């Protein structure tokens, strides 16, 4: 606490820490000013939680924000690049704004499921994610 270090926990699809309700529960039970949340909407979305509901619940505890995309296929989590799935990025950004989180940068996360592929191209990936986020920003 003396050094102002913040630890940001990230919920994760396919684990026991996969819903916004559980994330808030942990924040309330620990009740420590240096323990916050990394708001990664993809994990909540993949588990079936509504984007607005997830952001509304977790916003008071968010220290950082990132996004990737994905879905469950036969019970297995499959991640994809931001903008290459079905998460409504504009809705997510509007929910961040509505919850006064625009001061936090939104990081595009690349899952090891993509980065470990033989044909992974980091430049293409960075440009694709950037363009997806900018397209959403320009629409709102």
Q: Which sequence ranges carry the predicted segments?
A:
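Histidine-acidic metal/acid-base catalytic patches
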Residues: 17-39, 45-140
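Aromatic-lined substrate-binding rim segments of carbohydrate-active enzymes
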Residues: 1
């Amino acid at each position: 606490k003396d050094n102002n270090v913040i630890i940001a926990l990230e919920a994760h699809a396919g684990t026991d820490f996969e819903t916004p309700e559980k994330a808030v529960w942990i924040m309330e039970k620990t009740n420590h000013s240096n323990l916050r949340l990394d708001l990664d909407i993809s994990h909540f979305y993949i588990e079936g939680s509504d984007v607005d509901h997830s952001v509304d619940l977790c916003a008071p505890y968010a220290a950082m924000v990132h996004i990737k995309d994905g879905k469950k296929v036969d019970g297995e989590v499959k991640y994809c690049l931001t903008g290459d799935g079905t998460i409504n990025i504009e809705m997510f950004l509007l929910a961040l704004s509505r919850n006064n989180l625009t001061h936090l940068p939104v990081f595009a996360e690349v899952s090891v499921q993509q980065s470990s592929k033989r044909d992974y191209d980091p430049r293409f990936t960075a440009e694709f994610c950037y363009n997806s986020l900018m397209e959403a920003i320009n629409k709102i």
